[in-house]
UniProtKB/Swiss-Prot annotation:
GO terms for molecular function: adenosylhomocysteinase activity. NAD(+) binds at residues 150-152, 184, 213-218, 236, 271, 292-294, 339. Its EC number is 3.13.2.1. Belongs to the adenosylhomocysteinase family. Substrate binds at residues 53, 125, 149, 179, 183. The gene is ahcY. It is an enzyme of class 3 (hydrolase). Coiled coil: none annotated. This is Adenosylhomocysteinase. PROSITE patterns: ADOHCYASE_1 (PS00738), ADOHCYASE_2 (PS00739). GO terms for cellular component: cytosol. GO terms for biological process: L-homocysteine biosynthetic process; one-carbon metabolic process; S-adenosylmethionine cycle. It comes from the Archaea. The lineage of its organism: Archaea, Thermoproteota, Thermoprotei, Sulfolobales, Sulfolobaceae.
Length: 417
């Protein structure tokens, strides 16, 4: 079995971390029980680019128990948990990932998991693997379909669909209600702040926090910052989301204005250069810059490095940049995902639903091989509901069901006032 990780001797510690995650992922464990009995993925080759965390390990083990052969690479150069990677190798998973990869190593690892076995299913977090297969792989692969975990990745895949270049059907796992309403909002909302606190150990209360973007990630971060005592400003380009932020009680203004008053900045736009050098030059001395979007393009790190007259590392994941005007700004985790680079990512309880969706999406693609068009599909609602039902059951919560009379009422149109 091929693999490339940092240190196989870390496996015993990684196993304990995975056990801890699995204990808090009852939805995925329920699906694992069925997969173990039915083997719906028997003989299927899966190549996956995902954050190599203890929660991802629980998913990958579930796929293997379901009969799949899995090769895994990390979806961010700084997010891999090396002990977890080692534990997965001991479980028979081909892992090509370690914390601190450079760009060449990152893409080499993606190449390796395609070459190690020609995938039937492609799983991705950010669409780098999908893009690699479409741009770099000339051989004809027998790919049944793929999945995508993130908003950023779905945007890329939708662009590929629009250009007519998709080679296989995709399921946008990110678009499942049981994913984005919980993972994006509660997961990132908590874990991004966890990353900021681990990196800086600052007090949130009393600070002015600027959140760029008010999608599900942005609103989760904004609400949790407010809950910890920050005064929160939201910046947006979408008038509807900006209006939502106002109605939710946040101040809304352009980033050019917010940059003058903010103490902490968090980007969550899914777009490039939400914070540019022109904004950094306006910031207070000591402003903190962080990113909660998938790629390290939301803060103009390249421009910052070119502009700064002095750079020094202050703490792990904290770099101080002195600007030409003498002010200093502090960039966390080199502008990469602060929740995964400086902390451990989302809590297991929320990844339970996200990865339950991933497992069911893979099964769906295998069952529907050859029946789907080469386009991006939303997660089938019946699977979304299945995840919600299992999760509620695991929490000891019961809900009502529609009576026959209520079902009939909803299906007719003649009854009115």
């Amino acid at each position: 079995m091929s693999y490339k990780i940092k240190d196989l001797s870390l496996a015993s510690e990684g196993k304990k971390q995975i056990e801890w995650a699995e204990r808090h992922m009852p939805t995925l464990m329920e699906i694992r029980k069925r997969f173990k009995a039915e083997k719906p993925l028997k003989g299927i080759n899966i190549s996956a680019v995902l954050h190599v965390t203890k929660e991802t390990a629980a998913l990958v083990k579930t796929l293997k128990i379901g009969g799949a052969n899995v090769a895994l690479a990390g979806s961010n150069p700084l997010s891999t948990q090396d002990d977890v990677a080692a534990a997965l190798v001991e479980e028979g998973i081909s892992v090509f990932a370690w914390k601190g990869e450079n760009e060449t190593e990152y893409y080499s690892n993606i190449e390796s998991i395609v070459k190690i076995h020609e995938p039937n299913i492609v799983m991705d977090d950010g669409a780098d693997l999908h893009a690699y297969i479409h741009e770099k792989v000339s051989s004809k692969l027998d790919i049944y379909g793929g999945t995508e975990e993130t908003t950023t990745g779905v945007i890329r895949l939708k662009a590929m669909e629009k250009d007519g270049v998709l080679k296989y059907p995709l399921v946008a796992v990110n678009n499942a209600y049981t994913k984005y309403l919980f993972d994006n909002r509660y997961g990132t909302g908590q874990s991004a702040i966890d990353g900021i606190l681990r990196a800086t150990n600052i007090l949130i209360a009393g600070k002015i926090a600027v959140v760029a973007g008010y999608g599900w990630v942005g609103r989760g971060i904004a609400n949790r910052l407010r809950g910890m005592g920050a005064r929160v400003i939201v910046t947006e380009v979408d008038p509807i989301r900006a209006l939502e932020a106002v109605m939710d009680g946040f101040d809304v203004m352009p980033i050019a204005e917010a940059s003058k008053v903010g103490d902490i900045f968090v980007t969550a736009t899914g777009n490039t250069k939400a914070i540019r050098v022109e904004h950094m030059l306006n910031m207070k001395d000591g402003a903190i810059l962080s990113n909660a979007g998938h790629f390290n393009v939301e803060v103009d790190v390249k421009g910052l490095k070119e502009t700064a007259v002095k750079v020094r590392n202050i703490r792990p994941y904290v770099d101080e940049y002195t600007l030409p005007n003498g002010k200093r700004v502090y960039l966390l985790a080199d502008g990469r995902l602060v929740n995964l680079a400086a902390a451990e990512g989302h809590p297991s309880e929320v990844m339970d639903m996200s990865f339950a969706n991933q497992a069911l999406a893979v099964e769906y693609l295998v069952k529907n091989r050859g029946k789907l068009e080469k386009k991006v599909y939303n997660m089938p609602m019946e699977l979304d509901y299945e995840v919600a039902r299992i999760k509620l059951k695991s929490m000891g919560i019961q809900i009502d069901e529609l009576t026959e009379e209520q079902k009939e009422y909803l299906e007719q149109w003649k009854s009115g006032t």
